[in-house]
């Protein structure tokens, strides 16, 4: 059987990435050019700065990915690209590069939903068993997704306000931590205790929705009031208390989802899936079903996950034409206007 190679492009936020996937789940390369240092001084991602950085490095990422994989453009079977959700300017840079490369090399173009990429990153670790439930936790999204079969995604619960990763970064900024703050909060939390007892919004309610704005506000108010009064705050305990509230909410809603849907596997993915506290709680509390979490290198934004999701669409011959455009608010069940089924 002839090997299949998919080149994938990811540029939805502040990581420029190009990867090569061989067949179903073998990543030959996954080049990532991070912009974290450029955005640290702003305490978050500046869209215009992100777009300019993508333009500067994307050609080099293409070259490095092919070289690292040991193949040439003539060996490729298709080109995949993230077309949403994300920052519109950033998405357009990756789309333009992917479309130009596909057109120049007479290759089909596969449109990929960024969040489907996060979910399917788990395929690199082991074959997924369907139906499954996915908990997707990142800087821009917090979602529970039911996946009855490959490529069929149904959102069954999501945040009503802040995403969990966004909440981490905002409270991290209040504490003076470096952006992105999630890793540092996680590390500090392991040294502290849940002494501040922050609220767990909607944790006992029957639905599968999330809310983190109240938790974030409670944290910020406590911090500001203590500073105004000159009260001492223990940083490790602050982090432990915040993280305990977050994890209680995530675990409670995930358990409810697993009790309501006939899932054979739980996938936990997205940037926050790198959180060691979350991984520990999942291992301790969800033992009746297999839990799959991508390796750390595939938790953040990367083109490898886009390639892994694209492999499923390739099998279905789901390609787009060259009118494919960026969809910054793309939903899981939304397909591009240029969707072509061959």
Swiss-Prot record:
Documented EC number(s): 2.3.1.234
Chain sites annotated for binding substrate: 136-140, 169, 182, 186, 275
Keywords carried by this UniProt record: Acyltransferase, Cytoplasm, Iron, Metal-binding, Transferase, tRNA processing
Catalysis performed (reactions): L-threonylcarbamoyladenylate + adenosine(37) in tRNA = N(6)-L-threonylcarbamoyladenosine(37) in tRNA + AMP + H(+)
Cofactor binding, note field: Binds 1 Fe(2+) ion per subunit.
InterPro entries named in the record: ATPase_NBD (IPR043129), Gcp-like_dom (IPR000905), KAE1/TsaD (IPR017861), TsaD (IPR022450)
Residues binding Fe cation: 114, 118, 301
Listed CDD domains: ASKHA_NBD_TsaD_bac (cd24133)
Cofactor: Fe(2+)
GO terms of biological process kind: tRNA threonylcarbamoyladenosine modification
GO MF entry, a single one: iron ion binding
Subcellular location: Cytoplasm
Task performed by this protein: Required for the formation of a threonylcarbamoyl group on adenosine at position 37 (t(6)A37) in tRNAs that read codons beginning with adenine. Is involved in the transfer of the threonylcarbamoyl moiety of threonylcarbamoyl-AMP (TC-AMP) to the N6 group of A37, together with TsaE and TsaB. TsaD likely plays a direct catalytic role in this reaction.
Entry similarity comment: Belongs to the KAE1 / TsaD family.
Protein name: tRNA N6-adenosine threonylcarbamoyltransferase
Lineage, highest ranks first: Bacteria, Bacillati, Bacillota, Bacilli, Lactobacillales
Annotated gene: tsaD
